From Swiss-Prot:
InterPro entries: Restrct_endonuc-II-like, tRNA_endonuc-like_dom_sf, UPF0102_YraN-like. One of its GO terms (molecular function) is nucleic acid binding. This is UPF0102 protein PSPA7_4996. Pfam families: UPF0102.
Length: 125
């Protein structure tokens, strides 16, 4: 398996762990890996009446910084644009309040299971 395929598989595993964690917290899934010309939304969830756009970040090594630090201004802008397109295409959710959350999956210390942190309202649109 190539490094890129291995990385993609690990990313999908992190997204599945994050989704399962959020479901246990009472959120409902509206979409997974929703793609558009602007990018991809890892998870789209519903928390009460709030539409939640969730970015999942995984890190195996801290040498490049933590998972949260990897979401720079450019990535945030792509997430916001993707969320706007989601709401245009899925009009039934357009009038609901929205927020952007981040779930970090940390496997840097070899813990089993990995450490998950759910950061609500991680950034503003």
């Amino acid at each position: 398996m190539t490094d890129r395929a291995n990385s993609r598989d690990k990313g999908r595993q992190a997204e599945e762990m994050a989704c399962a964690h959020l479901l246990r917290q009472g959120l409902a899934t509206l979409g997974k890996n929703w793609t558009c010309r602007r990018g991809e939304l890892d998870l789209v969830m519903l928390d009460g009446d709030t539409v939640v756009f969730v970015e999942v970040r995984s890190r195996r090594h801290r040498a490049w910084g933590g998972a949260l630090e990897s979401i720079d201004a450019r990535k945030r802008q792509r997430l916001i644009l993707s969320a706007e397109l989601f709401l245009q295409q899925e009009a039934r959710w357009a009038k609901r309040p929205c927020r952007f959350d981040v779930v970090t999956v940390d496997t840097s210390d070899g813990q089993s299971p990995p450490r998950l942190d759910w950061i609500q309202n991680a950034f503003d649109a």
